[in-house]
């Protein structure tokens, strides 16, 4: 006799007096996006089946048949031969139906002591765990590329900005290492998130657990989980681990977006600090001269997309009572797209950073504008006994004078400087010009975390060691 699963297309058909409408089938089906969970679904099912056999809940023959059938199904999926059916709603029922078709009643016994509620929660955690590991590796690749570029430019000087106004000279290497720090924290957040992802829901069943004598710890060990979810209601209903991952991913993209904004500005002909390799740029269909930094621009845009996924998942969870609700089917597309977006972005950026051409002369010329060493002149006066606020006021006056004349502080002669700063003239000597050079300015910040070239090289070495390189 044909099973209800094959007769009506739903695993619960015997309860109802009429079949599901075609519109509702399309509305509720998830198979065409959750099929990417197929291989982890098979892994989870095999671990579950092995435990059932070990606990004498199913026979050794049933286990052998399940393992044989799953091996065939896995091969069909990997070769693109598996026929996904909308009528079977999701990845779980599609695989179960195929398994039953291949091995008969043994396939029907696989779901003993299990619900799709704990099954899908397990699948998502298994899948996400692997993706977190992959993203961690991609973050390391990007960090490595940034460290390489930073080491090459430990002595390259450019203006540092606050409020997009010239502030103080810094080295380009120091600037790049700021992003290494950001992406290092992102990697830490991913590792921290992974610890909470890596808990086994299987065994929670629908919501209350199961009456079968299962061994959840054995399944957890087989699947590489650090432990089990301690409460069955929580195990099947909460997606906070997905929200936490997406929040960490949103921070990754936020840091990428900040870097992207600078890349776009630096590549602008009005700035001209860098050039991005042609393979990462596009042209214009109407303007022949254009070379557009589309990759960093798109990354800025895709950051909003990931931020939107975070808000979608937060909103998805906020109104759900315990335990499982169908709302949770909507967790997958935002989660899947977040993973895809972050992974693609990191891979591209690591390659793009390695191909950046730096233009040191343009950077240096920009650093010579905007009185970037004014703070150094104030520090010079402070070191000779003047209170900082008085030094600040004196230098501000000198800047005003130079600005009106269209010159920089370093362009003043010693006599002119003393003339413009009569109240502190006795503190100013020939050595003042050592403080007003770009090289002198950055070299003086010679402490951990500072922009001095020696500190940049030391920081790059430490960052590389943290990567295990």
UniProtKB/Swiss-Prot annotation:
It comes from Burkholderia mallei (strain ATCC 23344). Keywords: Amino-acid biosynthesis, Arginine biosynthesis, Cytoplasm, Lyase. One of its GO terms (molecular function) is argininosuccinate lyase activity. Coiled coil: none annotated. Pathway: Amino-acid biosynthesis; L-arginine biosynthesis; L-arginine from L-ornithine and carbamoyl phosphate: step 3/3. It comes from the Bacteria. It holds the Pfam family Lyase_1. This is Argininosuccinate lyase. One of its GO terms (cellular component) is cytosol. The keyword Amino-acid biosynthesis applies. It is found in: Cytoplasm. It catalyses: 2-(N(omega)-L-arginino)succinate = fumarate + L-arginine. Its EC number is 4.3.2.1. One of its GO terms (biological process) is arginine biosynthetic process via ornithine. Belongs to the lyase 1 family. Argininosuccinate lyase subfamily.
């Amino acid at each position: 006799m044909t099973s209800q699963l094959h007769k009506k297309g739903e695993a619960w058909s015997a309860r109802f007096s009429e079949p599901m409408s075609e519109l509702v089938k399309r509305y509720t089906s998830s198979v065409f996006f959750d099929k990417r969970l197929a291989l982890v679904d098979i892994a989870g099912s095999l671990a579950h089946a092995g435990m059932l056999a070990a606990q004498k809940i199913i026979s050794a023959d049933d286990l052998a048949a399940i393992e044989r059938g799953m091996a065939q199904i896995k091969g069909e999926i990997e070769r693109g031969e598996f026929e996904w059916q909308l009528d079977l709603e999701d990845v779980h029922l599609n695989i179960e139906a195929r398994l039953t078709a291949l091995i008969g009643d043994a396939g029907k016994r696989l779901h003993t002591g299990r619900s799709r509620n704990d099954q899908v929660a397990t699948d998502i955690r298994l899948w996400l765990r692997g993706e977190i590991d992959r993203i961690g590796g991609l973050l390391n690749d990007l960090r490595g590329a940034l460290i390489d570029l930073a080491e090459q430019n430990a002595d390259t000087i450019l203006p540092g900005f606050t409020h997009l106004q010239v502030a103080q000279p810094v080295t380009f290497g120091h600037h790049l290492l700021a992003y290494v720090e950001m992406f290092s924290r992102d990697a830490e957040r991913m590792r921290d998130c992974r610890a909470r992802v890596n808990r086994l829901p299987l065994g929670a069943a629908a919501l209350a657990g199961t009456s079968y004598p299962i061994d959840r710890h054995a399944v957890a060990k087989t699947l590489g989980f650090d432990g089990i979810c301690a409460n069955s209601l929580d195990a099947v209903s909460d997606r906070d681990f997905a929200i936490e991952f997406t929040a960490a991913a949103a921070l990754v993209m936020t840091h990428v977006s900040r870097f992207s904004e600078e890349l776009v500005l630096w590549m602008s002909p009005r700035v001209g600090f860098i050039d991005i390799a042609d393979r990462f740029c596009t042209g214009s269909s109407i303007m022949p001269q254009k070379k557009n930094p589309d990759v960093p621009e798109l990354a800025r845009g895709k950051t909003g997309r990931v931020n939107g996924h975070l808000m979608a998942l937060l909103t998805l969870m906020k109104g759900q009572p315990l335990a499982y609700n169908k709302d949770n089917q909507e967790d997958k597309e935002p989660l899947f797209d977040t993973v895809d977006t972050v992974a693609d972005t990191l891979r591209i950026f690591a390659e793009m950073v390695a191909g950046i051409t730096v233009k040191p002369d343009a950077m240096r010329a920009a650093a010579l504008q905007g009185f970037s060493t004014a703070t150094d002149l104030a520090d010079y006066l402070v070191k000779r006994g003047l209170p900082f606020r008085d030094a600040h006021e004196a230098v501000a006056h000198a800047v005003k004078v130079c600005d009106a004349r269209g010159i920089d502080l370093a362009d003043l002669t010693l006599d002119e400087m003393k003339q413009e700063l009569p109240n502190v003239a006795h503190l100013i000597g020939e050595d003042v010009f050592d403080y007003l050079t770009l090289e002198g300015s950055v070299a003086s910040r010679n402490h951990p975390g500072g922009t001095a070239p020696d500190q940049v090289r030391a920081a790059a070495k430490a960052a590389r060691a943290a990567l295990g390189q």
